[in-house]
């Protein structure tokens, strides 16, 4: 999958390309992550990419022209890589909140061009003419779009085929089917007076599967009850709930 990131701080994305699951995917050429600095497309000796906002106010606004040139360059790279469906995504507090359903849709694209804002944001005309989607990672403000972009890339990359060493691990992650994850345990059997649940050591896989589902359902009900209404249960899961509720 092709990713082009428009950012003033390309070095930050070594966290994606050099480490962990996403780093392994990059080394295996499952993903291609290219960072494009809009300063390379700015005019003048200072390579300025920001200006004061019209109408006054604090801070600076990223200028449309260098960003547009950077996006067009990214589109050329995507085309050279054989990618057709490559929308431009702007990471913004005004965007829709990212969730697992959106991530799964991104997985089906050929690639993404991700625009990272800074300062007070970007010129609205750039958004109107070049941005296809705006996404947020939550209702809070960060210094720029780089961290949200890394969240977006990591969440997509781990869902791509052949990336996870254990495909079942990705399937069982929180939110994949609408439920939170179940409690996880490893050695030792006892820690500060707390024991691993006996059922997890029983070797009875059907009972373990049932226990894990019930734990996930109960945890979601307690911590994120609004998610329960969106969950589609299998016939077996409905039976487990019915048996548990008596």
UniProtKB/Swiss-Prot annotation:
Binding-site positions, S-adenosyl-L-methionine: 117, 137-142
Q: Which reaction does it catalyse?
A: guanosine(37) in tRNA + S-adenosyl-L-methionine = N(1)-methylguanosine(37) in tRNA + S-adenosyl-L-homocysteine + H(+)
Q: Which GO terms describe its molecular function?
A: tRNA (guanine(37)-N1)-methyltransferase activity
Provide one Gene Ontology cellular component: cytosol
Q: Look up keyword Coiled coil and say if it applies.
A: no
Main location per the UniProt record = cytoplasm
Q: EC number(s) for this protein?
A: 2.1.1.228
Question: Which domain of life, per UniProt?
Answer: Bacteria
What are the recorded Gene Ontology BP terms?
Answer: tRNA N1-guanine methylation
Spell out the Pfam families in the cross-references: tRNA_m1G_MT (PF01746)
Q: What are the cysteine partners in each disulfide bond?
A: none
Q: Which locations, inside or outside the cell, does it occupy?
A: Cytoplasm
Q: Is Cytoplasm among the key words of this record?
A: yes
* Subunit and interaction comment: Homodimer.
Q: State the family named in the UniProt similarity comment for this chain.
A: Belongs to the RNA methyltransferase TrmD family.
**Stated name of the protein:** tRNA (guanine-N(1)-)-methyltransferase
The organism is Acinetobacter baumannii (strain SDF)
């Amino acid at each position: 999958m092709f990713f082009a990131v428009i950012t003033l701080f390309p070095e930050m994305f070594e966290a994606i390309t050099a480490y962990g699951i996403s780093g392994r995917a990059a080394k295996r050429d499952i993903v291609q992550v290219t960072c494009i600095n809009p300063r390379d497309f700015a005019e003048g000796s200072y390579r300025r990419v920001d200006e004061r906002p019209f109408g006054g106010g604090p801070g600076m606004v990223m200028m449309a022209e260098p960003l547009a040139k950077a996006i067009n360059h990214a589109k050329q790279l995507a085309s050279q890589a054989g990618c057709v469906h490559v929308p431009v995504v702007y990471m913004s507090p005004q965007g829709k909140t990212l969730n697992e359903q959106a991530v799964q849709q991104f997985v089906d694209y050929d690639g993404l061009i991700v625009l990272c804002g800074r300062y007070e944001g970007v010129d609205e005309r750039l958004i109107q003419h070049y941005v296809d989607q705006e996404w947020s990672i939550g209702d809070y403000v960060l210094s720029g779009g780089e961290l949200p972009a890394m969240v977006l890339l990591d969440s997509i990359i781990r869902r791509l085929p052949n990336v996870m060493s254990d495909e079942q691990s990705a399937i069982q992650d929180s939110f994949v089917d609408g439920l939170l994850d179940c409690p996880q345990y490893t050695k030792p059997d006892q820690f500060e007076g707390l024991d691993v649940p006996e059922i997890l050591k029983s070797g009875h896989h059907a009972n373990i599967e049932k226990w894990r589902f019930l734990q996930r359902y109960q945890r979601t009900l307690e911590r994120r009850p609004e998610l329960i209404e969106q969950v589609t249960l299998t016939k077996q899961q409905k039976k487990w709930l019915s048996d548990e509720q008596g």
